[in-house]
């Protein structure tokens, strides 16, 4: 098996590690001079009130990253390291590091300044075993810490560990099979100064304010196992992935919860290759389900029960040009449907929401300068218990306003524009400057504080 085949499947398996350089890696030869190293620093700002309920009205962030890919005669290695510092003001709602990921949530409603630090480390290798077989492994560790030092003071420490061994069979340079097993562990440990001022969300913002006046701790952990099967040829590829999850959350002041879940995703992609342009069609499907069970104080039965089921369907078309400044142009159509059911005695509720999004994008290249542009528009519809949102009853055990703001952010009609400009500095070797910018606008607002959101990031990097 030639190393180009190994690199091909390294790009397929570890796209995050390779930083999106799959197309370039496919053309590499087994030559040490083709090894890649990248380093960069960046800073950015986000501002605007068209945002999730947990996000800052204004935030700044800065970070540094380094990535490398090395090729030997029979093996390839890759690795990356990054750090990010973020500070935002007027932050409230979820105390978790990734709000909405877990089916249980802890909320607070006093705006304040929150800071966060993220560290990411990953690495992997792929080795030729002979007789058209190759094996490899990918590993990644993420650590994050956030803290709020005023009003309801709290801090959160999170760790995510992921390991994915893989086995590859390559029939030739353009066709092969990949099988991957994945294991992941995700934990978050919350420390809250006064739990009595926090609201425990047991699903759809139903729950209760907590009792107690002393410090409290709330820990959440989740294990997941997954299997992936991937087939790839020159013009066709397909993938099926299944993930099984089981999590637990507990704390003396917060109660005990279990939350099993599963995810099934698949895609097929067909390419039509020509001398001057390639045409690619991609159809993706994803189904997620999370359940939440709260154990009663006596250990018998449940006092809360919620269920989230989501389905996403995406159709994407892209044309890649081999000549001229316009290198690619494409259209992406996305449709998703979510259902959430919550039982918090004595209430049973059901929410259904549907969202559609259309995105057009184009890529230009001239004199080493790269320009990517995109525009999008979308809208959604949702109903709570089959009623319109104006008919929702405001009950003491539900944070209705926070729920309505979050639903409006997800479902309101919107438009957006964005782009990325990368300019090389030839006089300093591989030095480059990159500017990314996005603008989002809500076309209808009732509960959110504003209709605009602007994001800008400036990066200075060096490709060795």
Task: Report residues per predicted region.
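Transmembrane beta-barrel strands of outer-membrane/channel proteins
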Residues: 39-45, 79-85, 137-143, 179-185, ...
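Residues that define the transmembrane beta-barrel architecture of outer-membrane proteins
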Residues: 58-64, 115-121, 155-163, 221-227, ...
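Membrane-proximal, glycine/serine-rich, low-complexity loop/turn segments characteristic
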Residues: 21-122, 127-133, 168-175, 180
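Outer-membrane beta-barrel translocator domains and adjoining extracellular loop/strand segments
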Residues: 49-56, 90-96, 146-154, 190-196, ...
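Long, internal scaffold/assembly segments composed of regular secondary structure
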Residues: 211-331
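Outer-envelope beta-barrel architecture signal
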Residues: 33-39, 73-79, 131-137, 173-179, ...
């Amino acid at each position: 098996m030639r190393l180009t085949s190994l690199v091909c499947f390294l790009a397929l398996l570890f796209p995050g590690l390779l930083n999106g350089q799959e197309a370039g890696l496919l053309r590499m030869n087994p030559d040490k001079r083709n090894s890649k190293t990248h380093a960069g620093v960046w800073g950015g700002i986000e501002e605007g009130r068209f945002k999730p309920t947990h996000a800052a009205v204004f935030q700044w962030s800065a970070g540094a990253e380094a990535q490398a890919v090395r090729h030997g005669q029979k093996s390839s290695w890759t690795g990356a390291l990054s750090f990010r510092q973020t500070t935002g003001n007027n932050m409230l709602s979820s105390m978790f590091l990734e709000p909405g990921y877990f089916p249980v949530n802890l909320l607070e409603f006093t705006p304040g300044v929150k800071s966060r630090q993220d560290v990411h480390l990953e690495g992997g290798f792929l080795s030729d075993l002979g007789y058209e077989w190759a094996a490899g492994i990918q590993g990644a560790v993420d650590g994050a810490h956030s803290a709020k030092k005023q009003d309801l003071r709290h801090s959160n420490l999170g760790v995510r560990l992921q390991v994915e061994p893989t086995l590859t069979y390559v029939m030739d340079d353009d066709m092969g099979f990949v099988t991957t097993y994945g294991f992941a562990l995700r934990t978050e440990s919350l420390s809250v100064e006064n739990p009595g001022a926090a609201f425990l969300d047991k699903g759809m913002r139903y729950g209760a304010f907590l009792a107690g006046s002393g410090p409290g701790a709330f820990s959440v952990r989740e294990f997941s196992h997954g299997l992936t099967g991937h087939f790839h040829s020159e013009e066709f590829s397909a993938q099926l992935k299944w993930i099984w999850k089981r999590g637990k959350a507990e704390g003396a002041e917060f109660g005990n919860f279990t939350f099993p879940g599963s995810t099934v995703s698949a895609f097929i992609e067909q390419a039509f290759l020509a001398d001057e342009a390639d045409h690619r069609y991609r159809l993706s499907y994803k189904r997620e389900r999370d359940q939440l069970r709260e154990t009663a104080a006596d250990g018998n039965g449940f006092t809360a029960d919620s269920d989230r089921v989501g389905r996403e369907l995406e159709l994407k078309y892209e044309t890649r040009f081999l000549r001229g400044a316009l290198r690619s142009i494409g259209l992406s159509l996305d449709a998703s449907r979510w259902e959430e059911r919550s039982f918090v005695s004595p209430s049973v509720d059901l929410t259904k929401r549907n969202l559609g999004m259309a995105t057009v994008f184009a890529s230009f290249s001239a004199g080493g300068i790269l320009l990517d542009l995109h525009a999008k528009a979308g809208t959604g519809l949702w109903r709570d218990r089959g009623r319109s949102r104006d008919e929702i009853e405001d009950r003491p055990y539900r944070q209705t306003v926070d729920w309505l703001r979050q639903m409006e952010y997800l479902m309101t009609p919107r438009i957006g524009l964005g782009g990325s400009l990368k300019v090389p500095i030839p006089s300093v070797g591989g030095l480059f400057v990159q500017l990314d910018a996005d603008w989002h606008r809500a076309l209808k607002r009732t509960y959110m504080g504003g209709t605009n959101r602007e994001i800008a990031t400036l990066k200075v990097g060096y490709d060795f």
